[in-house]
């Protein structure tokens, strides 16, 4: 997110303008860092049910109380675990239910600029993630999330001591970042 914001600012500065919004006054971009996404009751908890209300606390709060009265957004793109080497992003099920046109827009952008190997048109599974809360607030939102092609779950290093910078791929981050910039610059 920081690099995307830097790129937007740099592009505006190169054009002699200090504000991205002056270049594209109809387009506002919110960068949001969610918190407490993974704090939920595990599905294997023997002491009770898997309470959905215990997950994605940051996006629950934001979705229930927008930062500005009358806030609206055309759509959202939630980026989660988008830096692993050899990542492939499938069309996540909840994204396809609530925001198929946004999925199509992002995947088409990736393929148009040469990053199709990262964005598969195959359908993936459903993931309880921050985009669920945003969709429930009435804003179509998708989840770009890496899943392991062998297991159908998350990468093997997820939530382990090996979940560290060693496994972050510059190539994958570039593919996702360039795709997001393409989506932003071509938005009407």
Residue ranges of each PLM-predicted region?
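Acidic/histidine-rich catalytic neighborhood of metal-dependent amide-processing enzymes
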Residues: 2-98
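Active-site-adjacent substrate-binding region
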Residues: 75, 82-188
């Amino acid at each position: 997110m920081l690099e995307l914001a830097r790129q937007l600012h740099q592009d505006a500065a190169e054009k002699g303008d200090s504000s991205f919004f002056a270049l594209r006054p109809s387009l506002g971009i919110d960068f949001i860092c969610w918190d407490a996404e993974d704090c939920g009751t595990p599905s294997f908890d023997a002491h009770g049910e898997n309470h959905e209300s215990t997950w994605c606390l940051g996006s629950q709060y934001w979705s229930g109380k927008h930062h500005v009265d009358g806030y609206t957004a055309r759509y959202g793109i939630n980026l989660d675990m988008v830096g692993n080497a050899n990542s492939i992003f499938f069309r996540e099920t909840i994204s396809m239910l609530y925001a198929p046109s946004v999925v199509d827009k992002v995947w088409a952008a990736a393929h148009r600029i040469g990053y199709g190997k990262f964005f598969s048109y195959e359908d993936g599974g459903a993931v309880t993630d921050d985009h669920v809360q945003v969709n429930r607030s009435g804003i179509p939102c998708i989840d770009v999330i890496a899943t392991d092609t062998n297991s159908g779950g998350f990468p093997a290093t997820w939530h382990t001591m090996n979940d560290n910078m060693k496994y972050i791929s510059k190539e994958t981050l570039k593919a996702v970042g360039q795709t997001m910039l393409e989506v932003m610059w071509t938005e009407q």
